[in-house]
Amino acid sequence: MFLYSFVFLMLLGLSSAQTESATSPDEVETEPTMSTDQPETSPSMSTETEPTTETPPVTTPPPPDSLSVICTNEKMEVFLDHAKHDNLDLDKVTLKDANCKASGTLNATHLWMDVPFDSCMTNHSTDGDTITYQNSLVAETRASAGSSLISREFQAEFPFKCTYPRSAVLSVVAFSPRERIVYTKTAEFGNFTFTMDMYKTDKYETPYDSFPVRLDLDDPMFLEVKVSSNDSKLVLIPLKCWATPSSDLQDDKYYTFIENGCGKADDPSLVFNYGESNVQRFKIGAFRFIGESLNSNVYLHCDVEACRKGDSDSRCAKGCETSRRRRRSSLASSAGTEQTVTLGPMKISEKAEVGAQEAVSSLTIFAAVAGVLGVIVLFLAVALVMLYKRYRSPQSATRVVYTKTANEEGKLLV
């Protein structure tokens, strides 16, 4: 009996242990459920501490190909593909100067603006060979939903620039009307227009447009070199001007009349007064090269450089530089992009020799005519004398009568 009681108690204890082990997993499962509830509130708390509009706005780089620039000699033309920026407020797109706004030039995909060189906060920089103009399109983004005062979008800025060569070589080329320089365009690279003209008078009103121009020796040649741009501060200096008997810029036979921005001092016919301007004018007497044939051609060339007026270190600001001053200058020589503009040539006639030949010819003709007239007059005089004597002699001839006397052989009676 005791044995049965012991077995019953053992079985009862085992059953109680199984019941406790069965309920403990439920308790363990409820603990992770409680713990997962805690982190769910953490993201909501972190979103309440997002950055506000007090954070300084920064510029965002534009997507590739969203902005394109055309560099002309008069302005910069900027095109913005606003289809790639659907959050821009197109009514509030300006340049750096907020007063320079897009002038309604807008279509379904692009907005474009004409950008001047010398206003709207356009900046410029120079190096030895080029002038670069820089500005930016500044665009406001649309206000946040439900607010007309704040935005959590950054202000967008699209910087752009145009680079232009500073130097060129202008020439006159045989039997061709004048043309303007056109530089080959590359990305963000523009061109200035350089011209060289010769005018008919010192008023510089009417340029020659047909060549060759025929001149006599020492006739004045009124010449002008010019750079054209809408940048009102762009100026020009002729660094060197020279003449050759051929269109070859490097002809071994040449005559230099402007060097280092200085007119040739020993040429009394040259008049050149430099001042910072986009137009430079000078006058020089027509000449010929010794050893060349009569009515030979003369070709003129000028090496010019463009600068921004007010740049104290620019070559234009230095003006005429003697060789000594030039050696002291720290400014490097800028070769630039060389091009040719056509204008000529000039045919120079030998006025002095032609005049002498005409004088000799006139004297010869006069002598010949005088000689012929003299001979004619002489013959006429002789003929008149003979005729006079012939018709005069019967009436005026003296009759001679001899009479004899006693003492004389004869006596002449008249």
Swiss-Prot record:
Residues 70-323 form the ZP domain. The chain crosses the membrane at residues 365-385. Residues 386-414 are cytoplasmic. The keyword Disulfide bond applies. It is a single-pass membrane protein. InterPro entries: ZP-C (IPR055355), ZP-C_dom (IPR042235), ZP-N (IPR055356), ZP_dom (IPR001507). Residues 18-364 are extracellular. Keywords: Disulfide bond, Membrane, Signal, Transmembrane, Transmembrane helix. Component of the acid-insoluble and acid-soluble organic matrix of the aragonitic skeleton (at protein level). Residues 39-57 have a biased composition (Low complexity). The keyword Repeat does not apply. Residues 1-17 form the signal peptide. It comes from the Eukaryota. It is found in: Membrane. PANTHER family: DELTA-LIKE PROTEIN, ENDOGLIN/TGF-BETA RECEPTOR TYPE III. This is ZP domain-containing protein.
